[in-house]
Design a protein with these regions (language model features):
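Conserved alpha-helical scaffold segments that buttress catalytic/binding sites
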Residues: 1-170
């Protein structure tokens, strides 16, 4: 997504409020979350449910993409809130982003905590919730097990029920 495309998307987004639920395609446009976040004027924390870290450096210049929008947020935007990514494999954690304060709840932690009452919810609260700022939640559908929802990306292990329970209990 180059600068001209970003401006086109921003123009389209103006007619929608930042508060609420935004459904954006099947996962190819998760990077548009960064544009939504740029419209929020008050401090907030971010929780991202995703099977991928979305923290890759751009392959083609300074282009915003689904593979690197969280890196853009942390490195370039002056974002001061906490960022927590839920669902990524432990082997795919970006060490540089971890050093910059991004927290991760891995696929392995989800499996370990599965079945424990409030296990994952407590993990999420401990890692990211300050109680001082609102929380923006972004869900990439590829965090879900493919039995729950089929995307065109490799997928995670969460059920829809797990995802909703975590969001409701957090």
């Amino acid at each position: 997504c180059d600068d001209m495309a970003k401006e086109n998307f921003r123009e389209m987004m103006k007619e929608y409020p930042t508060k609420g639920i935004h459904f954006i395609d099947g996962g190819n446009y998760h990077y548009l979350t960064l544009l939504w976040l740029s419209l929020i004027e008050e401090p907030f924390d971010l929780i991202v449910f995703d099977n991928h870290s979305d923290m890759q450096k751009p392959a083609f210049g300074d282009v915003l993409s689904c593979g690197g929008w969280i890196r853009n947020l942390v490195e370039d935007s002056g974002f001061k809130g906490k960022v927590t990514v839920v669902g990524v494999d432990k082997d795919n954690i970006d060490k540089e982003m971890k050093e910059l304060g991004v927290k991760f709840i891995t696929k392995q932690t989800i499996l370990k905590k599965r079945g424990q009452q409030y296990g994952l919810e407590n993990e999420l609260i401990d890692k990211c919730w300050t109680g001082k700022r609102p929380v923006y939640i972004s869900v990439d559908k590829d965090v879900l097990d493919e039995k729950e929802y089929k995307t065109n990306w490799n997928q995670g292990i969460m059920s829809v029920d797990e995802l909703f329970a975590i969001i409701e209990d957090t």
